[in-house]
Amino acid sequence: MRKRNVRGICAFLCTILLECLIPAGEVQAQRALDVARERGYQLEERYQPAGSIITEINTGQILWQENAQKQWPPASMTKLMTILLAYEEIKAGNLELESTAEVNERYTDIAGRYALSNNKMQPGASYTVAELMDLIIVPSSAAATYMLADMVESDPDRFVERMNQKAQELGMVNTKYFNCVGVTNNLLQPYHPVSQPLDGDNITTPEAVSYTH
């Protein structure tokens, strides 16, 4: 519950920053939390983002940035890379949005782990690629991410290699993936990529995950 509350506050801070429409050059000395407080919002210090960036999607113009090159764990944003790789497989003709996968004991085990964001899964149930993508976005399902990743690449270690290769292709410097979910590998045992360390935690920067056309 606390994680969801923090996410909501961070989204709220982004909204405040967008409303301010302050040129990036004028806000470098200010923190996101300070901007919100100046406008009458009383927020605790723990809601100050470690780093942030807001860009105009079509032009790439930076509207706001704060510690945009600071490395930090992307958490569930990691799962977007799985969706991207799945779309590439669709484009290559290796997958379709209607392609299906069946829930097995591995996926139900992952779905039952309370330390992970998930959805309930019943053994034998089938999901299409499109349905798995929806579950990855909301409710950020770890089990759905595993299912989709396995459809793209059956070897978890090879899948992580592909994640890192794609990150390099996209120019995502200072980024390293250790798994497809966005938690430390010890929370995923025994399903973590065995070539990766148990304390491996994905790392990136706000700048690397900002999106523009």
Which residues does each predicted region cover?
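Active-site-adjacent loops and short helices of periplasmic peptidoglycan-processing enzymes
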Residues: A29-P206
